[in-house]
C-alpha cells in the first residue's frame, strides 16, 4: 500500500483509481499503510518534546518527561488508528444516502489515503515549534481536503455533484470529531491528566 504514497501526493486523480481497484482488506490496509503512517507523528512528537521541547514565542523551550511523553505518544497513536477506522465507517454508513454501495474496506482506504498529508506533516513534530507546526500544518490540512474532494467520486463511484455533497458531509463530520477531541483533551488536562514537565 505504501507504493501509492507518491502517486496520491503528486497525481491523486490517477492514483485514486489504482487504490480503488486494489483488492485490500481492512487488516491489509492497516498493516501496509495506516500502522506505519500513523506512527510518524507520535514517534517524532515523543523525541521532539523530550529532546528539544515546545517553543512558544520567545519563551524558553518546555520539555516533557519521558514517561509523560510516552503515554501521550501511545494515546496519540491509538486515537489516530481509531480515527481512520471511524471515519471509514462513517463514510461507509453515509454512502447509502448518496447512492454509493461500496464496502467498508474501500471506505477505510479512502479515509486512510485522504489523511496522507496529515500523517506526513507529523515529521515536523521533531521540531516542536508552535509557529512552524501551524505554518506547515495548514497546507497539509488543505491538501487533505483536496484529496477528499478528488477521491470521493472515484472511490465511491458516484458523479461529481454527489461527490461534492458527500465530501462536504464527510468534512463536516471530521470537523465535529476534531472539536470533540479538543474539548476532551482540555477536560482531561484540567482534571489531573496534564503532562509532566521537566527543566
Regions found by a protein language model. Name each.
Residues 1-99:
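Selected alpha-helical membrane-embedding segments in polytopic membrane proteins
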Residues 5, 83-87, 141, 145, ...:
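Alpha-helical transmembrane segments
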Residues 21, 32, 46-47, 51, ...:
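Generic preference for flexible, low-structure residues
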Residues 25, 49-50, 97, 114-116, ...:
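Residue-identity detector for threonine
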Residues 38, 42-45, 109, 153-154, ...:
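Juxtamembrane, membrane-proximal amphipathic segments and lipid-exposed surfaces
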Residues 44-79, 125-140, 180-199:
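Membrane-helix interface segments in multi-pass membrane proteins
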Residues 91-92, 98-173, 178-179:
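Hydrophobic alpha-helical transmembrane segments and adjacent short intramembrane/lumenal linkers
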